[in-house]
Amino acid sequence: MPWSMGKDSNVLLWLSLKAFFGKVPYPLLHIDTTYEFPEMIEFREWATKHYGINLIVKVNSEARSRGVGYETHDPVTVTHELKTVALKQAIAEHKWDALITGIRRDEDPTRAKERYFSPRDAESEWHYKHQPPQFWGQFAIKNAPGEHVRVQPLLDWTEVDVWRYIQREQIPIPQLYFARNGKRYRSLGCHPITHPIESNAATIEDIIAELEATRSSERAGRAQDHYEPHAMQKLRARGFM
């Protein structure tokens, strides 16, 4: 199960803990780009010990050794190399045939095209124009060798749903989501290309009220989404989460 330590990932972790009586039976995967916020790494180390997580940390060391980074490359290239390729490497190394992900349809128009069970080919690519229909609880879950399926239980949750669940269950999350000095992060990614929003929302109640009044995109602060037309769709077609 990919785990970014963001709010959606932590909700999915919490649901897994509840489903399996406090012990997640499958490994969690953190794709470490080496550009993580220090607060996220601190949270990762705390949560791994606190919940007894079997954590796999994957870095695309080959790309980093070639100098791939935000200092020298555009954000779409870096995202593909350090996130998508690293994910493909992890899937191949561990021979996984399924991933449980925390993506949601309301995050981005491209994710709105997704399915609860989303097949990926042997290159982890997503053929969004040729997805199998999913009617009356019938899901496509059989894979050919080398392929995998992405299981996406939060697909129909909204951003406010996520926050209300965090509030109800008192789920620990990184403090970067809460306002400090008039700014907070609404969505978390690599620190060089993730920008905070103007906000005074310092509590979950404040955040929910803020979201109920806003019309701006949740991922407006994520630079790779806006680098070129249809950037997110191109990234996801190649295997990005």
What are these regions (language model features)?
Residues 1-2, 7-241:
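Nucleotide-activated chemistry modules centered on ATP-dependent adenylation/adenylyltransferase
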